[in-house]
């Protein structure tokens, strides 16, 4: 059976001397992997369409196991990701998070649209770090994680938020922050932005500017929460941390 899908290449794996296994996150089928025979050869008709982050239409011969990529038509090469190491790093993080958390052939048009929109904004020059924070935040309910962003995790009141508690699963107000000795102190902007990112429509994203200190706090909150409740290891996250450490 042949299946035509619109999708984005989120992972490629070399297979033998000339072949690739490409993992595509598609609008129609969710995540699907296929063998791209001969794709490593420069003159192959599959060479360009099997590049990481390529957005296109793909014709896949489906089987009981791994499918076969028969042909592809490029919508966008998203070449910006091959021209900037920072964009490459953040795009890889987005794609790896999507890959790790999406089951094969699980239809999820919402996640496809979010993936496409995030990568598109990156190509347009929107702050990739902010976009990665938005994506991480919006992935929480997709993964079944619903931290307390609107109220205090203990008293459930909408009040002054001064810390984030991984143990309690959300923000803490000034009255209850002392109940978790491992709480993460946060500024008011961190709470407001995480709550905004969690709820707002990504299509409505306008000009966005966030202080470096605020982004650092948000990253700490999200990474610590993911580590506790999600338990996945992302190579791309490690690379981002190295870029930040050495200020490359």
From Swiss-Prot:
Q: Name one Pfam family in it.
A: RecO_C
Q: What GO terms in the biological process aspect are recorded for it?
A: DNA recombination; double-strand break repair
A GO cellular component annotated for this chain's UniProt record is:
bacterial nucleoid
Q: Which domain of life is it from?
A: Bacteria
UniProt xrefs under InterPro entries: ARFGAP/RecO, DNA_rep/recomb_RecO_N, NA-bd_OB-fold, RecO, RecO_C
Instruction: Establish whether keyword DNA damage is in the entry.
Output: yes
What are the entry keywords? DNA damage, DNA recombination, DNA repair
For this chain, the annotated S-S bridges are none
Entry's family note: Belongs to the RecO family.
According to its UniProt entry, the function of this protein is described as: Involved in DNA repair and RecF pathway recombination.
Know the name of this protein? DNA repair protein RecO
Name of the gene:
recO
